[in-house]
């Protein structure tokens, strides 16, 4: 210790002893202006053999027990360094040099657990709401709470928990050591916003040293003195992380990251779950770059979190909204394309849309009448075109195609748009013009149309352009030219049935549906309007 530092400390000791009680407030206001005093006091505390250590500890205790808050904070800034020296001396079994620091720590503890009347304090803690972001979670990952009567009753409810009573301690033991130190760290964290930068640096150095001392990682540090392994408590490490987290965002970014890694290293070795949870949450929430510390006197945490108010508007998606969107889309297609076919509505994903024609809005009825008019107008020209296409395809048909064609033509092909409503599952169908369905015998119509529509999607041939419900006449003509020998599962089943008996129908009007008569990838219902 230099002579100048010693003179500064001795002057400070004599000045406070001669200070009257009326000037304590003014003395506390000017104490922070002494720039050389704080570094000199750190040197005295770090040297356990210094003769000024005992009077300095006594002076710090007198400042803390005074009624002036600023004098208490002046003593609190040395608390991390005092803890490190105490733990280091405890491991080295140097009880004689450790007596004054131990008395100072116990004195601060006994002052904090009791009020002015000597009664024990009960500390209260407010449980934060999950709707606000923290280092553990983001509120966007939690679903919105239902607006119920119970939720409204608990809207302004503040949940508070209370700590147990802390008994007074006369001396340190192995059982109560970290109980006292954890409570002292709690007191330090409650006033950490008033601490200077030198106190933050001392906190980070203390946290790193107590975690890696006695472990192989200690040799990677550039410390002058080595220390034995220090026993730690999970609660003390959590309180240490609380102070380190604030110091990282207020000028100690590099030191804070170093001590954070050291705490995770020690917590993994000791299998402490609570420090691991807090430390990993802190590490995952850190930004990539150091926060802006150009502003002097800034005492806030700058953490980038997800906003509580969602920026993306979430509109409820219901069956009605899907139908409205589909009707608008089909109306636009009917106006632009002028097709003569009837587009069937897609089934809502996740919903069952088996509504009848009477449940449709009035605005869709004119579109149905316009479609019927377009069917009548184009029927004559379409039938002539179909005859030419059928004659061209018939010449290139194979014997197998003709067999399947005979069975396929036997199905009723007269479908009427006026009497049915089609509700397929994820497919678009189109009815060629000129197909009429009688309004009676609705049950056989459902069964027959289900089978025929299944075959029309699986069996791709040129004959489907004029004889069945297909994907479209023009598309069927192109597919017939390129894929004349393409068969699906249903067409192969029909071929086997045709070889067993050509004159036998695939499905009779009164026969029940079987697994072979249904397409595995498509389902359609035709509901007759009564």
Swiss-Prot record:
Annotated compartments: Cytoplasm, Cytosol; Cell membrane
Entry GO CC: cytosol; plasma membrane
Modified residue annotations for Phosphoserine: 321, 341, 430, 442, 444, 491
Residue ranges with Polar residues bias: 353-373, 514-530
Positions of post-translational Phosphothreonine modification: 30, 306
Region (Disordered): 328-410, 498-530
Record GO biological process: phosphatidylinositol phosphate biosynthetic process; protein localization to plasma membrane
Protein keywords: Cell membrane, Cytoplasm, Membrane, Phosphoprotein
InterPro entries, alphabetized: Hyccin
Organism superkingdom: Eukaryota
Family the entry assigns: Belongs to the Hyccin family.
SUBUNIT field: Component of a phosphatidylinositol 4-kinase (PI4K) complex, composed of PI4KA, EFR3 (EFR3A or EFR3B), TTC7 (TTC7A or TTC7B) and HYCC (HYCC1 or HYCC2).
Function: Component of a complex required to localize phosphatidylinositol 4-kinase (PI4K) to the plasma membrane.
Protein name: Hyccin 2
């Amino acid at each position: 210790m230099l002579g100048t530092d010693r003179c500064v400390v001795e002057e400070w000791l004599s000045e406070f002893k001669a200070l009257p009680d009326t000037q304590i407030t003014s003395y506390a206001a000017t104490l922070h202006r002494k720039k050389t005093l704080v570094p000199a006091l750190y040197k005295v505390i770090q040297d356990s053999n210094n003769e000024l250590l005992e009077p300095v500890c006594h002076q710090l205790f007198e400042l803390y027990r005074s009624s002036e808050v600023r004098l208490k904070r002046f003593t609190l800034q040395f608390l991390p360094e005092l803890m490190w020296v105490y733990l280091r001396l405890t491991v080295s079994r140097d009880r004689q040099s450790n007596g004054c620091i131990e008395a100072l720590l116990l004195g601060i503890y006994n002052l904090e657990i009791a009020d002015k009347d000597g009664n024990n304090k009960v500390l209260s803690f407010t449980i934060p709401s999950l709707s606000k972001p923290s280092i553990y979670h983001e509120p966007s990952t939690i679903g919105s709470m239902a607006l119920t009567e119970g939720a409204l009753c608990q809207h302004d409810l503040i949940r508070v928990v209370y700590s147990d009573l802390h008994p007074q301690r006369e001396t340190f033991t192995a059982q109560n050591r970290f109980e006292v130190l954890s409570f002292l760290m709690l007191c330090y964290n409650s006033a950490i916003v008033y601490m200077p930068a030198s106190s933050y640096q001392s906190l980070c150095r203390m946290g790193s040293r107590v975690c890696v001392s006695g472990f192989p990682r200690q040799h990677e540090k550039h410390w002058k003195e080595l220390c034995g392994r220090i026993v730690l408590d999970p609660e003390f490490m959590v309180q240490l992380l609380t102070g380190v987290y604030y110091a990282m965002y207020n000028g100690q970014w590099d030191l804070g990251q170093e001590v954070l890694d050291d705490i995770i290293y020690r917590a993994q070795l000791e299998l402490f779950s609570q420090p691991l949870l807090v430390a990993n949450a802190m590490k995952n929430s850190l930004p990539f770059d150091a926060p802006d510390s150009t502003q002097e006197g800034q005492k806030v945490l700058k953490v980038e979190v997800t906003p509580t108010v969602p920026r993306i508007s979430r509109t409820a998606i219901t069956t009605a909204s899907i139908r409205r969107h589909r009707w608008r889309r089909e109306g636009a297609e009917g106006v632009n394309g002028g097709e003569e076919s009837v587009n069937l509505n897609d089934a809502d994903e996740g919903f069952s849309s088996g509504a009848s024609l009477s449940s449709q809005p009035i605005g869709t009825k004119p579109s149905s009448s316009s479609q019927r008019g377009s069917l009548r107008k184009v029927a004559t020209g379409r039938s002539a075109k179909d005859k030419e296409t059928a004659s061209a395809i018939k010449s290139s048909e194979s014997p197998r195609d003709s067999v399947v064609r005979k069975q396929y033509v036997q199905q009723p092909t007269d479908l009427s748009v006026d009497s049915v409503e089609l509700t397929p599952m994820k497919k678009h169908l189109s009815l060629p013009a000129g197909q009429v369905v009688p309004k009676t015998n609705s049950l056989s119509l459902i069964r027959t149309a289900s089978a025929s529509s299944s075959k029309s999607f699986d069996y791709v041939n040129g004959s489907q352009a004029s004889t069945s419900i297909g994907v479209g006449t023009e598309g069927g003509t192109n597919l017939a030219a390129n894929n004349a020998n393409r068969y699906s599962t249903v067409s192969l089943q029909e071929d086997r049935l045709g070889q067993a008996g050509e004159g036998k129908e695939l499905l009779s009007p009164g026969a029940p549906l079987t697994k072979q008569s249904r397409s595995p990838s498509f389902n359609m219902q035709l509901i007759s309007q009564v």
